[in-house]
Design a protein with these regions (language model features):
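Non-catalytic, conserved peripheral segments adjacent to functional cores
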Residues: 1-48, 64-105
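Conserved SET/PR-domain catalytic core that frames the SAM/AdoMet-binding pocket
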Residues: 48-63
Length: 105
């Protein structure tokens, strides 16, 4: 699991090129101390059903690969230099552990 980090200005596009993954996003109401009551949205992205997920600014995101050798590509609207001062990180279980639970498929 790699989570959570967010940006106030930067948006991202996420694509799974190989395998599948849970991608979770949550709106940041306050970057210094976000509410743990914010609703987390989960998406299953897979190479079997190709989709691009848009993550707007003011959202935190994270992911959990569901298969060995899963390949995830993140596209950013900011350069690496621009995003350095716009990076906020939170523990993977900040909004609960159930986010990363894999239900029977």
């Amino acid at each position: 699991i790699r989570a959570f980090h967010g940006h106030l200005k930067e948006a991202k596009y996420v694509y799974v090129a190989k395998g599948s993954a849970i991608v979770a996003i949550v709106e940041l109401d306050n970057v210094e101390s976000p509410s743990k009551l914010q609703k987390v949205e989960r998406f299953i992205l897979s190479d079997k059903n190709p989709q691009i997920l848009f993550i707007p600014p003011k959202y935190a995101n994270g992911f959990r690969p569901l298969e060995v050798d899963t390949r995830i590509i993140f596209f950013s609207t900011s350069s690496l230099e621009e995003s350095k001062g716009d990076d906020y990180r939170y523990p993977a279980d900040y909004w609960g552990k159930r986010i990363w639970k894999v239900e029977d498929r």
